[in-house]
Amino acid sequence: MLDLQVIRPDPFVELDGEVVARIDGEPLFAWADAATAAVEARIAAGDLVEEAVDDHDVRKHYSDGADLVEDVGASKRRFPEEVIPAVAAIMKPLVVRERCRLRRLRVR
């Protein structure tokens, strides 16, 4: 079985390869930490065996800042209030980069 987790640090927004903003991932991390703890408990109990771990970047592409602000607004993540107008005004494609961990688990 595969377990995909979002991991720290906070996701960041890139414009033409340069970081222009960070997204507060803490609300999502709190939820993800609870899910991770549940899986870790099953590993500790011997019900699951962790066979492989891969930490990697995931990139999500947006057509412009308004598209990104709308998507973040509908998620557990948040932009700091002071950066929303500047990000929403960007009329070029943006990329959000975040760290994820993929684990291969086996039922014992």
What are the language-model segments listed below?
Residues M1-A34:
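Conserved class I S-adenosyl-L-methionine
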Residues L15-E18, A34, A38, D67, ...:
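Exposed alpha-helical structural elements
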Residues G25-D57:
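Active-site capping/gating segments
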Residues A44-R108:
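Conserved Class I S-adenosyl-L-methionine
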